[in-house]
Design a protein with these regions (language model features):
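Membrane-integrated ABC transporters
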Residues: 1-30, 37, 45-59, 66, ...
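An intracellular "coupling" helix at the cytosolic face of ABC transporter transmembrane type-1 domains
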Residues: 10-13, 99-103, 119-132, 136, ...
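Transmembrane helices of ABC transporter permease
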Residues: 11, 15-28, 60-63, 69, ...
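Hydrophobic alpha-helical transmembrane bundles that constitute the permease/transmembrane domains
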Residues: 20, 24-32, 65-72, 124-127, ...
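Hydrophobic/aromatic residues in alpha-helical transmembrane segments
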Residues: 33, 37, 74, 78, ...
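Short intracellular "coupling" helices and adjacent cytoplasmic loop segments at the cytosolic face
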Residues: 47, 83, 91-115, 119-121, ...
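Helix-loop-helix
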Residues: 49-53, 144, 148-162, 232-305, ...
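ABC-type nucleotide-binding domain
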Residues: 325-583
Length: 583
């Protein structure tokens, strides 16, 4: 864990080194000041030596200024180092997340990743700054104060040892108890973020089902759980202050009583007693700071472990040593492909799939929910790796390609598409950042998106709200199809992406595909047989097994599942879901 986190500090080694240096300088200056005060009282005030008071007073001001300068510089470099550390952590996590395959992403919840990128990183930032400053300042101050106290009067300094031992034991108990509660807080932050995310992203569904009160209660409960944990933790930490005060005041009373007796006896001066009392406060404050450091470190350890889970998670899909940088054509072959999401699972999602698809063919993929239609096409762009067998694109195993090269040649349009905040032009150019306005319009004509875009007052400069909330489901799907076409892919996958489009528009889109992109291999996943019956060939999937593969006419003649569903759909009484489960 330390090695993983330490890699994010390298850029700020100088700041991380200078911070404790200035902290040590500040502590040394603060340690000298009580001695100078004692000298002013004993050799200046009581002796009536004004010159000595002026000289020592001037020196004390200089030392205080040096201490102030050192503290300021320590704070500056500490803030720079901790903020830079946090920045690098966020960047490293975000960049690593971008490399994740779908199977890596499945290990984390979205809310959990957000919490790690925000709350957990902030905890580590605060802990690192505290580590550079307080973790240096507190023990050095404690040691210096103890040394000076024994130097002044070893007998009175023994009072410190008793106080330090008592306070140290109590603070250790408090720290351990608080750490237990803080360890339970962070998973509850995930629950809170998940509640917010689900509610905001599905606000229309919430309102449609009048579930606002339920969502409020769910959020309130998640927030209350965090509150309860923090109350317990802070309740334990609240003992810090009263315990500190009791020990400090007891120590001061003991020092004052013993010191007064020693002053009367002539074995201690007034200035020395004042110095001892000042060092007493320094020692107790150092212990207090150390206790807070331990609590913060206890919190940050939990955060550090969660962050390292993300940083140490390596994508199980990587480029080969000598990748292929060119896809010859859009041909696709499934060679005895078996696939499992969980490698330890006994039952495969896809079982011994054998298919050979020529470049430029239009392939329909039909099956009920749970028949693994999406899983099949996800293997083409290597979003997952096969468990057994091989998937070939352009005659080569997809595992031999450079990932960017392969995925640049495969465009996928999902049923639940995502549009980003920005103009229509900006969204379209996700497919090709260098696309001209005319190329964008041409892609929209193929996707039949120009029909509604031209009706917008701002046309292609119309601003799309976050998530595409100001366009309908069908409009969103057509914009996403246009975006995919701008990639000019060798393989186009439409994963039930015309489900929100009317039948007439669906037919227009299919006709445009046949005429305008005949060399592109097209996979059309659909529930409606009418959407794929004109395809060159159709794959019938049933529970992860290829039940049939052929033309519409061939399947009607030879495949019972296809024929039954076709007849039920043409009579308006059924679909593939009668044959399957979840996709």
């Amino acid at each position: 864990m330390l090695k993983t986190l330490g890699a994010q500090i390298k850029e700020f080694k100088k700041d991380s080194f200078l911070t404790p240096v200035f902290m040590i300088l500040e502590v040394l200056m603060e340690t000298i000041i009580p001695l100078m005060m004692a000298s002013i009282i004993d050799n200046g005030v009581e002796a009536g030596d004004i010159h000595h008071i002026y000289v020592m007073g001037g020196c004390m001001v200089i030392v205080a200024c040096i201490s102030l300068f050192a503290g300021t510089m320590g704070g500056k470099y500490g803030a720079r180092a901790s903020a830079g550390f946090a920045r690098n952590l966020r960047k490293a996590m975000y960049e690593n997340i971008q490399t994740f395959s779908f199977s890596n992403i499945d290990k984390f919840s979205t809310a959990g990743l957000v919490t790690r990128l925000t709350t957990d990183v902030t905890n580590l930032q605060n802990a690192y700054q505290m580590l550079l400053r307080m973790c240096v300042r507190a023990p050095i101050s404690l040691i210096c104060a103890m040394i000076m106290a024994f130097f002044i009067n070893a007998r009175l300094a023994s009072v410190y040892l008793i106080a330090v031992i008592v306070l140290g034991m109590i603070l250790a108990i408090i720290t351990v108890r608080a750490h237990h509660y803080f360890m339970e807080v962070f998973p509850k932050y995930d629950d809170l973020n998940a509640s917010v995310q689900e509610n905001v992203s599905a606000i229309r569904v919430v309102k449609a089902y009048v579930r606002e009160d339920y969502e409020k209660k769910k959020f309130t409960q998640a927030s209350k759980n965090i509150y309860n944990m923090f109350v317990k933790a802070e309740g334990v930490l609240a003992f810090n202050s009263p315990v500190m005060q009791i020990v400090v005041y007891s120590c001061i009373i003991a020092l004052s009583w013993l010191g007064a007796k020693m002053i009367v006896a002539g074995s201690l001066t007034t200035g020395e007693l004042m110095s001892l009392l000042t060092y007493c406060m320094n020692i107790m404050m150092s212990l207090m700071m150390l206790s807070m450091v331990f609590v913060m470190l206890a919190m940050s350890i939990a955060s550090a472990e969660r962050i390292c889970e993300v940083l140490n998670e390596k994508s199980d899909i990587t480029n080969p040593e000598n990748p292929v940088y060119e896809v010859a054509d859009g041909s696709v072959t499934f060679d005895h492909v078996t696939f499992r999401y969980n490698k330890t699972s006994d039952k495969p999602i896809l079982d011994d799939v054998n298919l050979s698809i020529r470049s430029g063919e239009t392939i329909g993929v039909i099956g009920g929910t749970g028949s693994s239609k999406s899983s099949l096409v996800n293997l083409i762009s290597r979003l997952y790796d096969v468990s057994e067998g091989a998937v070939l694109v352009g005659g080569k195993d997809v595992r031999s390609y450079d990932l960017d090269t392969l995925r640049d040649e495969v465009s996928v349009v999902l049923q639940n598409n995502v549009l980003f905040s920005g103009t229509i032009y900006e969204n379209l150019r996700w497919g090709d950042k260098n696309a001209t306005d005319e190329e964008c319009r041409h892609a929209c004509r193929l996707a039949c998106a120009d029909e509604f875009i031209d009706r917008f007052p701002d046309g292609y400069n119309t601003y799309i709200e976050q998530g595409g909330t100001n366009v309908s489901g069908g409009q969103k799907q057509r914009l996403c199809i246009a975006r995919a076409l701008l990639k000019k892919p060798k393989i186009l996958i439409l994963d039930d992406s015309t489900s929100a489009v009317d039948t007439a528009t669906d037919a227009k889109i299919r006709k445009a595909f046949a005429e305008e992109i005949p060399d592109t291999t097209k996979f059309i996943i659909a529930q409606r047989i009418s959407s794929v019956q004109n395809a060159d060939r159709i794959i019938v999937l049933d529970n992860g097994v290829v039940n049939g593969f052929g033309t519409h006419e061939e399947l009607l003649a030879s495949n019972d599942i296809y024929r039954d569903v076709y007849e039920s759909q043409t009579s308006g009484s059924g679909d593939f879901d009668e044959k399957g489960g979840d996709q």
